UniProtKB/Swiss-Prot annotation:
Cofactor(s) the record lists: heme
CDD domains reported in the protein's UniProt record: CYP164-like (cd20625)
Record-given protein name: Biotin biosynthesis cytochrome P450
Annotated residues for binding of heme: 89-93, 285-287, 343-345
Source taxon at top rank: Bacteria
Lineage: Bacteria, Bacillati, Bacillota, Bacilli, Bacillales
Disulfide bonds: 250-275
Gene3D superfamilies: Cytochrome P450 (1.10.630.10)
Role according to the record: Catalyzes the C-C bond cleavage of fatty acid linked to acyl carrier protein (ACP) to generate pimelic acid for biotin biosynthesis. It has high affinity for long-chain fatty acids with the greatest affinity for myristic acid.
Length: 395
């Protein structure tokens, strides 16, 4: 059975959840095709969690290994831990994890607070702002660039690479996006290789220098180090930007929940978790079966692709009471927005911290925050929940 490509319309982008419900009603593991991508589409929570934990389901790069047209892009993707299986994934993750331990993440808090206030200072007197370009994107950019070790004068370039390369891993990628991504991959790889050479000569307190310390011991190649930086730049931008902007929209669309958070800012932790569940920044992740696997009443054959719809799993009524209700006091809230198992998001604690500080500070400094008279739209991406822009007003 084929899923009609018309579901990639603006209606689907605005609200994919009714589509997810339709699939789940047929079977939580549904065999079909979407935008010419055949495979198993998983909408059930238990099924999604089970597959994410099962090492027999492997990751692979979005571009076929035999692809020759976009060789540079394919080469960069092949070096990223996101598309590595064990033991290489564990090796790369261990090397990068030092920048994202709970203690290290907590140490970023003063810089995040300072940056949030600086960005809000720029718009406070204008009585309006565009949440993404004025606030969420520059915040995410400053923070991840600071962690990686990218100089301030190069951060605009980092944003451009991240915006281009994210499109190359989505279902909706076009030849134009892949061609541009191939060019950006060359530029980003060359840039980070040069920066790595500088850090070899002059180490600093950043992630590049940290990766170089562990390079010889764990046989980290220069290209793996550069690709790790590129991956974290992409993830550090997209996840955080989408989390903050989606959260602001959710709260403004649900004034009773917004009032609850204003009256009790200590609810920010559960509020961010509910925003993650309700509008997951990452809507889909993929795996491929390494052998014939019987799971949840179906047999997935070796080589078949499995698409895990995280946004659907987060609204599975067998796990979440009233799943379509936005409730910032929801607890427990075991959403899968950051994944599950070995590939759980490395920077999840950082994204949470940025969102909590950004949202609470925004609400405190702009107590009359409202949505502008504007028809907001989502970027044409299937795997990510990403607003194009979000204008707001305030007194």
């Amino acid at each position: 059975m084929t899923i009609a490509s018309s579901t990639a319309s603006s209606e689907f982008l605005k609200n994919p959840y009714s589509f997810y419900d339709t699939l789940r009603a047929v079977h939580p593991i549904y065999k079909g095709s979407f935008l010419k991508y055949p495979g198993w589409y998983v909408t059930g929570y238990e099924e999604t969690a089970a597959i994410l934990k099962d090492a027999r389901f492997k990751v692979r790069t979005p571009l076929p290994e035999s692809s020759t047209k976009y060789q540079d892009l394919s080469h960069v993707q092949n070096q990223m831990m996101l598309f590595q299986n064990q033991p290489d994934h564990r090796r790369l993750r261990t090397l990068a994890s030092g920048a994202f331990t709970p203690r290290t993440t907590e140490s970023y808090q003063p810089y995040i607070i300072e940056t949030v206030h600086h960005l809000l200072d720029q718009v406070q007197g204008k009585k309006k702002m565009e949440v993404i370009s004025d606030f969420a994107f520059p915040l995410a950019s400053f923070v991840i660039a600071n962690i990686i070790g990218v100089p301030e004068e190069d951060r605009e370039q980092l944003k451009e690479w991240a915006a281009s390369l994210i499109q190359t891993i989505d279902f909706t990628r076009s030849r134009k996006a892949l061609t541009e991504g191939n060019i950006m991959a060359v530029q980003a790889m060359a840039y980070f290789k040069e920066l790595i050479q500088k850090r070899k000569r002059h180490p600093q307190q950043d992630m590049i220098s940290m990766l170089l310390k562990g390079r010889e011991k764990d046989k980290l190649t220069e290209e793996e180090a550069a690709s790790t930086c590129i991956l974290l730049a992409i993830a550090g931008h997209e996840t955080t930007v989408n989390l903050i902007s989606n959260s602001v929209l959710c709260l403004l669309q649900h004034p009773e929940q917004l009032l609850k958070l204003r009256e009790n800012p200590d609810l920010i932790g559960t509020a961010v978790e509910e925003c993650l569940r309700y509008e997951s920044p990452t809507q889909m992740t993929a795996r491929v079966a390494s052998e014939d696997i019987d799971i949840c009443g179906v047999t997935i054959r070796q080589g078949e692709q499995v698409y895990l719809l995280l946004g659907a799993a987060n609204r599975d009524p067998s796990i979440f009471t009233n799943p379509d209700v936005f409730d910032i006091t929801r607890s427990p809230n075991p959403h899968l927005s950051f994944g599950h198992g070995h590939h759980v998001c490395l920077g999840s604690s950082l994204a949470r911290l940025e969102a909590q500080i950004a949202i609470n500070t925004l609400l405190q400094r702009m107590p009359s925050l409202n949505l502008a008279d504007f028809e907001w739209r989502y970027r044409p991406l299937f795997g990510f929940r990403a607003l194009e822009e979000l204008p707001v007003t305030f007194e």
